[in-house]
Amino acid sequence: MIDKRDDKPFKLKSKYKPSGDQPQAIESLVDNIEGGEKAQILLGATGTGKTYTMSQVISKVNKPTLVIAHNKTLAGQLYGEFKEFFPDNAVEYFVSYYDYYQPEAYVPSSDTYIEKDSSVNDEIDKLRHSATSSLLERNDVIVVASVSCIYGLGSPKEYADSAVSLRPGQEISRDTLLNQLVDIQFERNDIDFQRGCFRVRGDVVEVFPASRDEHAFRVEFFGDEIDRICEIESLTGKTIGEVDHLVLFPATHFVTNDEHMEQSIAKIQAELAEQLQLFESEGKLLEAQRLRQRTEYDIEMLREMGYTSGVENYSRHMDGRSPGEPPYTLLDFFPEDFLIMIDESHMTMGQIKGMYNGDQARKQMLVDYGFRLPSALDNRPLRREEFESHVHQIVYVSATPGEYEMSQTNTIIEQIIRPTGLLDPEIDVRSSMGQMDDLLGEINQRVARDERTFITTLTKKMAEDLTDYLKEMGVKVKYMHSDIKTLERTEIIRDLRLGIFDVLIGINLLREGIDVPEVSLVAILDADKEGFLRNERGLIQTIGRAARNVDGHVIMYADKMTDSMQRAIDETARRREIQIAYNKAHGIVPQTIKKDIRGLISISKTSHNDISKEEMDYESMSRGERKEAINALQKQMQEAAELLDFELAAQMRDLILELKLMD
């Protein structure tokens, strides 16, 4: 039985106090939640402190909260901010744990079967386990997630019921504990002690939970009784302290007991027989042979090991669900009365809607050609209406709410005033004739003031041509395209803030969540080309990138005024008017946002020693020695980045740059 700690309140720690229209927004949101309002919108302009407002609301309503962002980068940024606001509570991070993922697929036109290929990030897997275990053990939990939280995860009841609960004085033999650990997918490894493993030394069993990365537990037996349980450092074995209760959750989210496994296998066999009969009646002998071979192999693995590659495709049988019934997801791990906050809801809700259809189209092909049983179709993300059925209370957060959110509620709470007094930027509309020379002049003005520039284009070719042109003109510029990975994107933003380059060019990467106070100019090329990237919502989001600097300015290059441009300009002017009036009434002088230059997310520290300039005298080294030092630093930098410790990786990157300049 898991003893859930439900008496610990959320405790917000911050040097800031609500200001501007934050107090009114916080009070309205809290009153509506406590009054039972199901859905409401926080319409917060860029830079008004929406995350701080969300934190204040969470601390006041005191409910377990799920915050959903539309990509890993934004989820990481929010995770870092919530960790700072709630250091004494459980702030968790739940995103897809794949560094690389090629889903299983079949292309009939070329008779090509593509096997599932993936690379799991061990650090993120640990954080996912930490999230689910926290939800089952306590109520003061904030989980920051990407939309991967609506994918199948395994039954929370099976996960909780399989947990092993241990206390000093408990009567249980060492061998019984070992069998229980194997049943919940822990592996015995007396040499390489890592997450999801245990090791045995006489009457001592050491267990490394799947949700930890530095600390494990030592269970000491005296006969058939637990004598003592200690928390230990996993690397050194040094005792940190004694614990009076230890709960060990399964090492995988897909777990079942022996009796349930046999029932599941019987259902898989029955479905297999039915599908084989169908294929044979249709003359699809190759498909029938393929399906029999693959499924019987999986059944054998499930019987022998309790697990098989692709076990999630049998999750309907494992969970005891009916055909078409929605899968269990992270949302099922929350108690009934929980709060959902959707960040950048105009993007995130669109993703939630689109996940199901794309998944089904790919899997149907696998079923039709005998690679998977039809039940594999029920290993899927939730449909939007299924997601809605989990919603008890929800807050949509966006500077530009979408039509869906607007259709869900009439309760819209505006947050327009920035705590720093910053105004929405002034907007110029200029002709596209001679735009390159005009833009170069504007960039040079910003470079002279040590400020940065964002440029957004509509096509990859224009972005590349503009990058080449500006480089020829002596501008330090980078182009951020869609092929750049998340970690690299984070480094590019950091380099821009540090002034390693002055201009960043992109297509659809400059709109939400890129927080660079040093940017004082946003240039929008082809502003009059109506479409997804140049509609009212997209333009307002892009304009918002210049709203964190006191000298923020936006230039739209266009040959005509579109309705979207006019509406975006009018809305920005409306907000400016409100902000100017507030500043005047309260004697506020606008100030550029001050924000530390750090990685977007820092989850854990690497175990590697940082080679600092103080520790090693690089200047007295020979060129060859410095080259060796650079190679060593580059290796450590890569390892730090893989562990998502961007701050350490960035420090090493800066040191490498300095060393290269010495030569």
Swiss-Prot record:
Domain of life: Bacteria
Gene that encodes the chain: uvrB
Keywords for this protein: ATP-binding, Cytoplasm, DNA damage, DNA excision, DNA repair, Excision nuclease, Helicase, Hydrolase, Nucleotide-binding, SOS response
Residues binding ATP, per UniProt: G44, A45, T46, G47, T48, G49, K50, T51
Annotated spans, Disordered: 1-23
GO MF annotation, one: ATP hydrolysis activity
SUPFAM superfamilies, sorted: C-terminal UvrC-binding domain of UvrB, P-loop containing nucleoside triphosphate hydrolases
Keyword flag Nucleotide-binding: yes
Localization (cell): Cytoplasm
Disulfide linkage: none
Family membership: Belongs to the UvrB family.
Entries under InterPro entries matching the protein: Helicase/UvrB_N, Helicase_ATP-bd, Helicase_C-like, P-loop_NTPase, UVR_dom, UVR_dom_sf, UvrB, UvrB_inter
Start-end of Basic and acidic residues biased regions: 1-10
Protein name: UvrABC system protein B
Summary of the function given for this chain in its UniProt record: The UvrABC repair system catalyzes the recognition and processing of DNA lesions. A damage recognition complex composed of 2 UvrA and 2 UvrB subunits scans DNA for abnormalities. Upon binding of the UvrA(2)B(2) complex to a putative damaged site, the DNA wraps around one UvrB monomer. DNA wrap is dependent on ATP binding by UvrB and probably causes local melting of the DNA helix, facilitating insertion of UvrB beta-hairpin between the DNA strands. Then UvrB probes one DNA strand for the presence of a lesion.
GO CC annotations on file: cytoplasm; excinuclease repair complex
Subunit note: Forms a heterotetramer with UvrA during the search for lesions. Interacts with UvrC in an incision complex.
Primary subcellular site in the record, as a coarse category: cytoplasm
A single BP term in Gene Ontology: nucleotide-excision repair
Positions occupied by motif Beta-hairpin: 97-120
Boundaries of every UVR domain copy: 627-662
Domain Helicase ATP-binding: 31-271
Domain comment quoted from the record: The beta-hairpin motif is involved in DNA binding.
